[in-house]
Amino acid sequence: MLYNVSIMVNLWSALASRDVRLLKNQIDKLNSLPENCWFVNYLRCHDDIGWGLDEDVERYLDIDPLKHKEFLYHFYEGATPGSWSMGELYNYDEATRDARSCGTTASLCGIEQALDKNDKIALDYAVKRDLLLHTAMAFLQG
């Protein structure tokens, strides 16, 4: 049994980019495994999010891996227009432009930002994002 970090990063990627192609590819791979293969699916844990997406699949889908990774870690630190997230950038490497993201599920889904701004509409959307991700967890093979 393994931790399924790939599903975790692909769920967060799909949520921010509003593009489910990488997630669908990962779910198709997961569903093609023998029935005796099991994973622990999760949204967040005590660790940072290392954006280890499948770069070959990204290129096949005409997604630039580095630009996509930069979008994700900037989105989840709240530095991208339209971001609802209040996560934190972690371990940025200027030479490789690699970085990781930190934050709770609530912070990354926008609950923290909505509460800080006392924005009931934003809070409703943030809770719906959180529920969407948790619903996916309930139905993914694991």
Locate the predicted segments by residue.
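Active-site and adjacent substrate-binding regions of carbohydrate-active enzymes
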Residues: 1-142
